[in-house]
């Protein structure tokens, strides 16, 4: 009888130890796993900023230590009329980050897309200069010492590395880029200032981006980092090109951030890459192969892709400041409606039910020695 009790006691201790071990593993988060390496961030929607879903909110606070506003700081929302700013949501966003001791990234000051209608009517250089000075100075000054970094200019390059035609280039010429960084630095000398773009890990666009950064510096602009958006696919871009980009941008003496990371598992019409919001195509069943669930075989491919990417990030952790996912979970991803509306994509680490996917565990595994 005594022997049986000892066995029962031993079995109980083993079971208890196993349960505690599982609980401990589950409490480890992305931000904790990578806290010695770089920030792990996410883009927040309006509803998430307003904490409308308690389960989502708990997940955000547990897993991430950096935040970017997905939309509400873009000009059409924050500066809807010439003499009117609306800081209601941006105030909530910054307060959310401060309350949760998160790195706060402002997105974005100058971008050719999602402009307020009144901005699109600006036709001459004098009016454009006045707009840029007022817009950048007002917003950056308001959050001086509270926002940690800004995307000063977003997506100003074509795929071949030349400057994109935009209302800013057409009215002010390429000097608008230097002026934007000067204005932001004057408004908050200590905040980190970034240029942000997609596909700028591809050779031609990367070369154009490097030349642009050099011009901004030569013109007296303060630029602290480059944002590589990282809207990628299962097989694009190559790890070699990503690594070249990290090395070549870092060699300029600036920080490298991956700012909008997601990995599409769906076919793209015409096999286009990147994140040009003007790309829109009609959908069909072939373009939406996984409307209900992602097959295990594709889950494995997604997990392997994320694993290889984060292994590379860790190799160059001394050069990388932040890795931000473009959304918290699959259900909110912009890729469900781009470049084809109404599809079901699975590009992030958490599914639409907020459950961690195989890709999540593979990302965690890359750093499980710490």
What kind of region is each of these model predictions?
Residues 16-18:
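C-terminal motif of bacterial Sec signal peptides marking the signal peptidase cleavage site
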Residues 66-80, 89-194, 198-200, 267-268:
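Substrate-binding cleft and catalytic face of glycoside hydrolase catalytic domains
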Residues 20-22:
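Bacterial signal peptide processing site
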Residues 32-33, 37, 45-57, 167-285:
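Noncatalytic carbohydrate-binding groove/subsite architecture in carbohydrate-active enzymes
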Residues 121, 142, 151-174, 183, ...:
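Aromatic-rich peripheral "rim/lid" segments of glycoside hydrolase catalytic domains that contact
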Residues 2-11:
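Sec-dependent signal peptide recognition
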């Amino acid at each position: 009888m005594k022997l049986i009790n000892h066995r029962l006691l031993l079995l109980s201790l083993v079971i208890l130890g196993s349960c505690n071990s599982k609980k401990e593993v589950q409490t480890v988060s992305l931000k904790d796993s990578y806290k010695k390496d770089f920030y792990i961030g996410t883009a927040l929607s309006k509803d998430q900023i307003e904490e409308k879903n308690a389960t989502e909110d708990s997940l955000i606070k547990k897993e991430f230590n950096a935040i970017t506003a997905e939309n509400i700081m873009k000009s059409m929302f924050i500066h809807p009329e010439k003499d009117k700013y609306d800081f209601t949501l941006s105030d909530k966003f910054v307060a959310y980050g401060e309350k949760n001791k998160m790195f706060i990234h402002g997105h974005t000051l100058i971008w050719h897309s999602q402009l307020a209608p009144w901005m699109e009517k600006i036709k001459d250089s004098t009016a454009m200069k006045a707009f840029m000075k007022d817009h950048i100075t007002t917003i950056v000054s308001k959050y001086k010492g509270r926002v940690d970094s800004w995307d000063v200019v977003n997506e100003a390059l074509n795929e071949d590395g030349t400057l994109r035609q935009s209302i800013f280039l057409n009215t002010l010429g390429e000097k608008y880029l230097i002026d934007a960084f000067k204005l932001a630095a004057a408004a908050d000398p200590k905040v980190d200032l970034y240029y942000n773009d997609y596909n700028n890990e591809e050779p031609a666009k990367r070369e154009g981006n490097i030349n642009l950064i050099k011009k901004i510096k030569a013109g007296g602009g303060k630029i602290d980092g480059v944002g590589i958006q990282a809207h990628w696919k299962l097989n694009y871009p190559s790890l070699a090109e990503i690594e070249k980009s990290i090395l070549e941008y870092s060699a300029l003496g600036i920080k490298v951030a991956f700012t909008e990371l997601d990995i599409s598992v769906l076919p793209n019409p015409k096999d286009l890459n990147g994140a040009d919001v003007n790309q829109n195509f009609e959908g069909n069943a072939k373009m939406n192969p996984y409307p209900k669930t992602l097959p295990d075989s594709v889950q494995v491919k997604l997990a392997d892709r994320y694993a290889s990417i984060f292994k590379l990030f860790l190799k160059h952790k001394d050069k990388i400041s932040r890795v931000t996912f473009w959304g918290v979970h699959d259900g909110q991803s912009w890729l469900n409606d781009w470049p084809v509306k109404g599809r079901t994509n699975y590009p992030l680490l958490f599914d639409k039910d907020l459950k961690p996917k195989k890709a999540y565990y593979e990302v965690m595994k890359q750093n499980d020695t710490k």
